[in-house]
Amino acid sequence: MFRGATLVNLDSKGRLSVPTRYREQLLENAAGQMVCTIDIHHPCLLLYPLPEWEIIEQKLPRLSSMNPVERRVQRLLLGHASECQMDGAGRLLIAPVLRQHAGLTKEVMLVGQFNKFELWDETTWHQQVKEDIDAEQLATGDLSERLQDLSL
């Protein structure tokens, strides 16, 4: 399980250094093989260990190519999916087209989200967090049953 938000830097070649606390887990569970794709709802990237991505990849063909929304999801997720292998120094090369999509330049937030990571431009990440907190403070609607069961 991946959790927490960590500031990492992209080098001049577009590589990010995976924090040490995740490297062993990624090597053990995925042999350092990762898949990166776009998030279809936010200006960030999704970074999956290969076994986690394969679960999603098995579900994508079940979507109907005749349904425009389902076909769009297939096209966006699979069409942007790019494999990346962690090198001996614990770095991952993020494809240029993906970096451009998320506006990633130098300072990147690596955000653990259970079975995957999100990659955000640092400034965009902080703006998103502020928007999310502001939205929660203004929310007056009823909580879903799942949120009601989540006691913090």
From Swiss-Prot:
Residues 5-52, 81-124 form the SpoVT-AbrB domain. Its main location: cytoplasm. SUPFAM superfamilies: AbrB/MazE/MraZ-like. One of its GO terms (molecular function) is transcription cis-regulatory region binding. GO terms for cellular component: cytoplasm; nucleoid. GO terms for biological process: negative regulation of DNA-templated transcription initiation. InterPro entries: MraZ (IPR003444), MraZ_C (IPR035644), MraZ_dom (IPR020603), MraZ_N (IPR035642), MraZ_sf (IPR038619), SpoVT-AbrB_dom (IPR007159), SpoVT-AbrB_sf (IPR037914). It comes from the Bacteria. It is found in: Cytoplasm, Nucleoid. It holds the Pfam family MraZ. Keywords: Cytoplasm, DNA-binding, Repeat, Repressor, Transcription, Transcription regulation. The keyword Heme does not apply. Belongs to the MraZ family. Negatively regulates its own expression and that of the subsequent genes in the proximal part of the division and cell wall (dcw) gene cluster. Acts by binding directly to DNA. May also regulate the expression of genes outside the dcw cluster. Forms oligomers. PANTHER family: TRANSCRIPTIONAL REGULATOR MRAZ. This is Transcriptional regulator MraZ.
